[in-house]
Swiss-Prot record:
Gene (UniProt): hap
Annotated ranges, domain Autotransporter: 1156-1409
Molecular-function GO terms, alphabetical: serine-type endopeptidase activity
Residue ranges, compositional bias (Basic residues): 1068-1077
Protein name in the entry: Adhesion and penetration protein autotransporter
Length: 1409
């Protein structure tokens, strides 16, 4: 056992200030966020204990300086919450004597959280420094009060020893200084300092909260004092956050860092200063020697020192019930004779004295209050180094006196119900004290010291325990009545203590609390059930240090959420649906054993929620049966904002709790297994990792990750109140999103019995997923899984807009869906399984077999070698360039086999080598159906032998269904100079070019003739072999390995190269002749349509001749259809011009209706919507959606009318290959119409401007101006109410030229001048129910011809032709006139040479004066 000299260790840290006999850390710099000073004082935000190099920025975001560069951040837990004192001994604080207004102190966290169980320590004696005595040479404004209990929440701070203040100016030995206080709060500005005036902003009164920072620099020293001076607006040697004292800071502590001892020490307490400027402060140095010699020694008069050699002393303790007691030591004599006794008198609680009394303070006017009764009790020190026994004869109240033990002791009562009451128990290192006595009800036993308190009395103890250090073992035994309770309430505080259970019934679990900074609850292999765990902060820790027994923690949640109406001081936490535990489960110290511990969440109802926001490190399982279980990080704690609304707005911070969504603490959770047997488990935001295997079952569900820019349920616990809230939050702020890490889910996930798991957003699963029994798994919203998915028995997995790095295996009616994602790994599907791809792409890594496959606008890439550059040109892989078939797994061609049904629509992407007739393949059953596109990337080399490249084959030689359709992307595959088409031959699909195949056939015939010559010179066996090969359908031009045959082939190849060279240097006419000669021979294996060959040949001619179009124009019949040859850029240019002109025609169509209609409206508006599809031989089909709005006015004349129409048209056009175009047209038109009897004659003129823009980012708007004029005539036949009106008209259009560039393609459109002809007839019938109402249905047929307009548009250097065609319009409408209002509506159908069958509707409203 370690022997230590009796000198109590005391540790405290705090800062405070006094002003000229008054309590004055209240001045801070307005240019720095006030929250820095608040967080500094409470060890929150950046200023956590031990932090270093803390950067401080001003309100403009500029770096002011760095705090704590030479020392770790101090622990301010030793400072009283009112800021006027600091803990320097087990029950002693230090301050200034003129602070007479405080009679108690408390320690710990701020806030109203009832789980903290804040304890009030009463001052029983002031211990004012008696300066008038000769032996006391220092100022009398100093005291070190004694408290009635040992303080458990904090460890006392060490004190400086030198009373010569100048030694502390040495910044080498003392590089850091800080202070803290709760005086009046002022904000000081640069201008205040420059003009030497009081600080501008008085923001708070004294004693409401703490602020802290570094001190000013030392400017002088006196007799037991030091003086510091400076200003708060400028950083100094100690840091960027200097603070100055104000009224209310008297007694607040100043701390200094001892570089040699590497620890913070309390240096002084603030006495004087400049209360309105925050400049100089005067401090009283700490008087350590006086404390030990004249304070602690007086309060610990009874000292039983250790004996050498150790003895087993027996002590008897009895109260005389008059404020004194007798302590008798019986020990054997050294010579072994009769035992000897030592008797001592000790002071106890003295009820005969006053409860409170006043003590005159000479350092300041007034009196101090103290408690004579309590103070009368003194400490007892027992230093027996054997195994001592202390027997308490009767109930003892030791007042403010406590028991110190050095060595092993047994403390027992004469009877089981004997009680002891006092300041507490302190046990030295390596010592164990067996505690067999009770403490009275409502009394708290304070346990300090690093030794062990073994509580093993009998019966039911009604007192409570606060464990602040060392270990407490609860091993209470049952009395004769079977009652057993170690304590009614057990508190674990300061983070230094461990409470160990030796049975489950030592204390009611719901009466265990983790106070300020918590500590360890060691279950020691036993199990507890909590309604909720009372906890204050992340210092709470529940562990199992037992090496053999498993322990369980069960949490049930609050049974009732309705608080009783007849009860006062309701603890809302006991009636809340949502509860939280902010501490740890499982040991985190690697030097301590982490035994097996299981956590079970078993709420009574489904609407209960448990938030775990601390962490777990379990060798055991986490099990949930119902309710909601959240795993989450937590907001970084910040000091509470006590400022009122005005000051808070100036600082730009919310009132009350400071929670910034971008400033959270990440948490980790670890368990062997997560068993989710019911309810919902949620792994929420700021969980950096969660480790363990998951099993989700019985309709339960689990969700991992949060999704940016979507609503997420986030749960947080208030540090201030302890209450937990869960709310829906939309994570849209970029700063917040960037602060949330991607949750690493390390482990496998198993789903059974209709379970559901969702992994989405900021989450990554590193493990496999197994699903059975109708369970569902979803990976979505950019989440990632690295691992395999295995599905069976009707399970369903979906990957939607996410990344899966692993294989998928399906059995027994399972289903897998890939949506909005790209997948690079293997999928294998057994019988009755289905794979569905929706807006997805899948790249196969190797051969794949599936049962059923459904594509919905998706792409399957059969080979990773397939890729395309931005301009759709193939990007070649070396493996496909080789002249031999690739053999390695990386470079081979792949086969996709679908044994069941292929359905839907999508794209299959292949790699191929026509040179070697090798490619990826698709093998299908005769159940396959649907429409698909094949995209083939070829090496670019032309074939040199005659074979067939089959891409799609049937299984078991069964023909494929006619319901199965494949279309080649771009209708061709380029290979060398030719384009290959997709043909269906004997139920299979292959690439085919008749010209090339005929050419190769001719080469093969010549090769066969050469072989026959060689065969005559060879033995019969060789000849037979060569003959057999020649008959094969897939025979190569080179078929013999013999030297003579190979030599002949070399000669043939050389000749072929020579012929190719000649062909390339010949004129186009020679090329055409060669192609025609190739067509004259028959291709016996694959018959083909000669007309198709003609078209294909002509197309080749057109492609070769395009650069010479201007010089050698050819008619349309020779060229084929232009739209099949032009690029998307050319097509978009022609489509854009067509769409612009058609918008102008739409305006004229409305004017044509106006001329035919005899409406007399003076003012009208017209709205027309239509959707049209245009197509021609010049450009590919496009769709135009137009919204036309018109306002018109007209004036009636004697024999006619005149008027004007303003038109505005907006069009959304979709050209081929989904090229988007947006266009507007604005026109102003005027018209006049004259009537001779039934004959009408009219004229019109118009001018307008169009603006059009392609959707590509680099394109600019295309502007065109246009004018038109025209004439029209009509004749009206009237047969009663029936009217028949034929009409005709012509309009001349002038459209200016426009040159522009789109994606580096130059487009030139010439100026246009053309006529638009129209003719038609209208039939109507008029009903007149009353004089003021008429109704007129009508039928209208109109024919428009613009075929005379031929345009030549130049794209780069190629001239393209374009016309505008003709079209019919049929319209049915109804016109009604009520009083002066006119309303008409119509439905029309249109169709023409370039216009498909279309419908449009219109509404017109007019008014006539």
């Amino acid at each position: 056992m370690k022997k230590t000299v009796f000198r109590l260790n005391f540790l405290t840290a705090c800062v405070s200030l006094g002003i000229a006999s008054q309590a004055w850390a209240g001045h801070t710099y307005f240019g720095i966020d006030y929250q820095y000073y608040r967080d500094f004082a409470e060890n929150k935000g950046k200023f956590t204990v031990g932090a270093k190099n803390i950067e401080v920025y001003n309100k403009e975001g500029q770096l002011v300086g760095t705090s704590m560069t030479k020392a770790p951040m101090i622990d301010f837990s030793v400072v009283s919450r009112n800021g006027v004192a600091a803990l320097v001994g087990d029950q002693y604080i230090v301050s200034v004597a003129h602070n007479g207004g405080y009679n108690d102190v408390d320690f710990g966290a701020e806030g109203r959280n009832p789980d903290q169980h804040r304890f009030t320590y009463q001052i029983v004696k002031r211990n004012n420094y008696q300066a008038w005595e000769r032996k006391h040479p220092y100022d009398g404004d100093y005291h070190m009060p004694r408290l009635h209990k040992f303080v458990t929440e904090a460890e006392p701070v060490g004190m400086t020893t030198n009373m010569d203040g100048k030694v502390y100016a040495d910044r080498e030995n003392y590089p850091e200084r800080v202070r803290i206080g709760s005086g009046r709060q002022y904000w000081r500005t640069d201008k205040d300092e420059e003009t030497n005036v009081h600080s501008s902003y008085y923001v708070s009164g004294a004693y409401r909260y703490l602020t802290a920072g570094n001190t000013h620099t030392q400017s002088g020293n006196g007799n037991g004092t030091v003086n510091l001076s400076g200003n708060v607006v400028s950083p100094n040697h100690y840091g960027p956050l200097p603070t100055g004292g104000s009224k209310g800071d008297s007694g607040s502590p100043m701390f200094i860092y001892d570089a040699k001892k590497k620890q913070w020490l309390i240096n002084a307490v603030l006495q004087t200063g400049h209360p309105f400027f925050g400049r100089g402060n005067g401090f009283q140095l700490i008087r350590e020697e006086w404390f030990y010699n004249e304070v602690l020694a007086v309060d610990t008069p009874s000292v039983f020192q250790r004996y050498i050699p150790p003895i087993n002393g027996h002590y008897s303790f009895v109260s005389n019930n008059d404020g004194t007691g007798k302590l008798t030591l019986t020990r054997p004599s050294k010579d072994g004779s009769k035992a000897k006794s030592e008797v001592g008198t000790v002071k106890l609680f003295n009820p005969s004295l006053n409860q409170t009394a006043k003590e005159h303070v000479k350092a300041a006017a007034g009196y101090n209050i103290y408690q004579p009764r309590m103070e009368y009790g003194k400490n007892i020190y027992l230093g027996d180094q054997g195994k001592g026994t202390l027997t308490i004869e009767n109930n003892i109240n030791q007042g403010a006196g406590g028991l110190y033990f050095e060595g092993n002791f047994v403390v027992k009562g004469k009877q089981n119900n004997i009680t002891w009451q006092g300041a507490g128990v302190s046990i030295g290192q390596d010592a164990t004290v067996e505690w067999k006595v009770h403490n009275p009800e409502n009394d708290r036993l304070s346990k300090i010291g690093i030794g062990t308190l073994l509580v093993n009395g009998k019966g039911k103890n009604l007192g409570s325990l606060s464990a602040g250090n060392g270990k407490v073992i609860l091993d209470q035994q049952a009395d004769e009545a079977g009652q057993k309770q170690a304590f009614k309430e057990v508190g674990i505080v300061s983070g230094r203590a461990t409470v160990q259970l030796n049975s489950t019934d030592q204390v009611d679990p719901n009466n265990i609390y983790f106070g300020f900074r918590g500590g360890r609850l060691d279950l020691n292999g036993h199990s507890l059930t909590f309604k909720r765990i009372q906890n204050t902060d992340e210092g709470a820790m529940i562990v199992n240090h037992n090496t053999t027994q498993v322990a369980n923690i069960t949490i049930t949640g609050n049974e009732s959420i309705t608080a009783p109406s007849n009860k006062k001081n309701i603890n809302k936490l006991d009636y809340s649906k949502e509860i939280a535990y902010n501490g740890w489960f499982g040991e985190t110290d690697k030097n301590k054993h982490n035994g097996r511990l299981n956590l079970i969440y078993k709420p009574t109802t489904e609407d209960r929620t448990l938030l775990l926001s601390g962490g777990t490190n379990l060798k055991g399982d986490i099990t949930q049966t119902k309710g909601k279980l959240f795993f989450s990080g937590r907001p970084t704690p910040h000091a509470y904002n006590h400022l009122d609304k005005r000051w808070s707005e100036m600082e730009g911070i919310p009132q009350g709790e400071i929670v910034w969504d971008y400033d959270w603490i990440n948490r980790t959770f670890k368990a062997e297994n997560f068993q989710i047997k019911g309810g919902s488990a949620v792994v929420s935001r700021n969980v950096s990792s969660i480790e363990g295997n998951w099993t989700v079952s019985n309709n339960a569900n689990a969700t991992f990750g949060v999704v940016p820019n979507q609503q997420n349920t986030i749960c947080t616990r208030s540090d201030w109140t302890g209450l937990t809230t869960c709310k829906t939050v939309n994570l849209t702020d970029t700063k917040v999103i960037n602060s949330i890490p991607i949750t690493q889910i390390n482990g496998s996930i198993n789903l059974t019995n209709n379970a559901t798991v969702n992994i989405h957003g900021l989450a990554k699963l590193n493990g496999n997923v197994t699903l059975i029994d109708h369970s569902q798994f979803t990976l979505s919203n950019n989440a990632t899984q690295t691992g395999n998915i295995k599905l069976s028995n009707h399970a369903n997995a979906t990957v939607n807009n996410a990344t899966l790095n692993g294989n998928v295996h399906l059995t027994d009616s399972a289903q897998f869906s890939l949506k909005n994602s790209h997948f690079w790994h293997q999928i294998q599907g057994d019988k009755d399984t289905t794979v569905t791809l929706e807006n997805a792409t899948w790249t196969m890594p190797s051969d794949t077999t599936l049962q059923n496959l459904t594509l919905n606008n998706s792409t399957v890439t059969l080979n990773s070698a397939y890729s395309a550059s931005s301009n759709n040109a193939p990007r070649h892989r070396r493996s496909l360039e080789t002249e031999t078939t690739p053999t390695s797994a990386e470079h081979r061609f792949n086969t996709l086999t679908v044994n069941g049904k292929l359905s839907g629509q999508g794209t299959f992407q292949f790699t191929s080598s026509l040179f070697g007739y090798k490619s990826d393949k698709l093998k299908l059953s005769n159940d396959a159906e649907g429409d698909y596109t094949l995209s083939v990337r070829n090496t670019g080399k032309e074939p040199v032998t005659l074979e067939q490249l089959t891409l799609i084959e049937s299984l078991d030689n069964k023909p494929l269904s006619d319901k199965l359709k494949f279309t080649l992307e771009n209708d061709h595959v380029d290979a060398g100079a030719l384009r290959y088409k997709l043909v269906k031959n004997k139920g299979e699909f292959r690439l085919h070019n008749p010209i090339k195949e005929q050419e190769l056939l001719n080469d093969l015939v010549r090769a066969e003739q050469a072989e026959q010559t060689l065969e005559a010179k060879q033995v019969e066996q060789t000849a037979e072999k060569q003959k057999s090969k020649a008959k094969a359908r897939s025979r190569r031009a080179v078929l013999s390995d013999t030297p003579s045959a190979q030599s002949l082939l070399n000669a043939l190849e050389a000749k072929q190269v020579e012929q190719t060279t000649e062909t390339q240097t010949s004129k186009p006419k020679t090329k055409k002749g060669r192609s025609k000669r190739a067509l004259s021979a028959a291709f016996s294996d694959t018959p083909f349509d000669l007309s198709q060959l003609k078209v294909f040949e002509v197309k080749l001619e057109v492609i070769n001749a395009q650069p010479q179009v201007k010089k050698e124009p050819q008619d349309q019949e020779e060229q084929g259809k232009q739209k099949e040859l032009i690029s998307r850029y050319s097509n978009s240019a022609l489509s854009e011009l067509s769409a612009t002109v058609n918008s102008m025609f739409s305006v004229q169509d409305e004017l044509d209706r106006l001329f035919v209609d005899q409406a007399q409206s003076a003012l009208w508006t017209n709205i027309a919507q239509d959707k049209r599809r245009y197509d021609s031989d010049a450009f590919r089909a496009y769709q135009q959606k137009t919204n036309l709005r018109q306002i018109g006015v007209q004036k009636a004349l004697d024999n006619g009318r005149i008027g004007a129409v303003f038109s505005h048209s907006r069009s959304d056009n979709t050209f081929d290959e989904q090229v988007k175009n947006h266009a507007t047209l604005t026109m102003m038109s005027g018209f006049a119409q004259y009537q001779w009897g039934d004959l009408q004659f009219g004229v019109n003129v118009g001018a307008g401007i169009s603006a059009s823009k392609m959707a590509e980012e680099q394109s600019r708007k295309i502007h065109r101006k246009a004018i038109n004029y025209g004439v029209n005539a009509s004749y009206q036949f009237r047969l009663g109410q029936l009217g028949i009106q034929p009409y005709l008209g012509v309009n001349r259009y002038f459209i200016e030229r426009e040159n522009y560039q789109s994606e580096e393609v130059k487009v030139q459109t010439p100026s246009l001048a053309f006529n638009r002809y129209n003719a038609g007839i209208r039939v109507d019938y008029t009903f007149t129910p009353t004089n003021n109402i008429s109704v007129k249905p009508y039928f209208f047929v109109n024919y428009v011809d613009v075929s005379n307009a031929n345009v030549q548009t130049t794209v780069n250097s190629t001239m393209l032709q374009q016309s505008f065609g003709r079209y019919w319009q049929k319209e049915v409408g109804l016109k009604a006139e009520i009083l002066h209002f006119q309303l008409s509506a119509f439905i029309s159908k249109s169709q023409g040479s370039q216009l498909g069958k279309q419908q449009n509707v219109g509404v017109k409203l007019g008014y006539r004066w």
